Amino acid sequence: MKKGLITSILALTFTGLQAQPLPATPKLVVTLTIDQLRTDYMEAFSSLYGEKGFKRLMREGKVFYQTEFPFSGTDRASAIAAIYSGTTPSMNGIISQQWMNANTLRPMNCVDDPAFMGNFTDESSSPSQLLTSTIADELKVATRNKGMVYAIAPSRDAAILAAGHSGNGAFWLNENTGKWCSTTYYSEFPWWVSQYNERQSPDFRIRDMVWEPIHPINRYTFLPEWRDQPFKYKFDSERINK
């Protein structure tokens, strides 16, 4: 009797599993990494978000409120390496944005690599210091190298570490010229990026840009200490990082 009951349950279980269609494989995967965006800010400013942005992600996605990595003293580079590889600096090798080169006794960037030239930059870069696989690399493996992986960021360490070892391209802003640049480690520099640099790069438009809150200051109810300090910044100087 017990044997028959167990067999019936298993049969029903397998039947139910077979009846469920497999989820469709996503054709596009987008990863956004925003430096200094704390989880409590996501909730505090939720009333200001559009319906198709953060609100949709929080409503339809999976939110992890207490995710931690077991290491301290993080900076941008070590944090991005940890997020994209799922490992700590002791495993992925990215202990900081910069460290002392044991051979030259001079500071070096975590993506410095003299073996490769830069495109629209004098900096030589590659992900050679990254010792582990990343989600971008695993996507390449899963698609048998048919997937396309690109990373775009304001800084080169963020772009290169996000693109991983097998990405198709990594692009970041040259802080001196305002043009998008890359490294010869990846495939040939796309013609459309060169065209954009020559016609529409931020360097041509930044003087007309104004950085200020998108909403009236009184709508930012969770920042009472800033309400008496209206923020407005123009990019019309010749300074680096303008």
Q: Where are the language model's segments positioned?
A:
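Short, structured active-site-proximal loop/turn typified by the sulfatase FGly-forming signature C/S-X-P-X-R
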Residues: M42-M91, M148-I152
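Bacterial Sec-dependent N-terminal signal peptides
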Residues: M1-A24
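Extracytoplasmic/secreted cell-surface and envelope-processing proteins
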Residues: T39-E43, R76, A159-A163
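Second-shell loop/turn segments in exported
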Residues: R38-A44, E68-P70, T121-P127
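Beta-strand elements within well-structured catalytic alpha/beta cores of enzymes
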Residues: P26-R38, L57, I83, L139
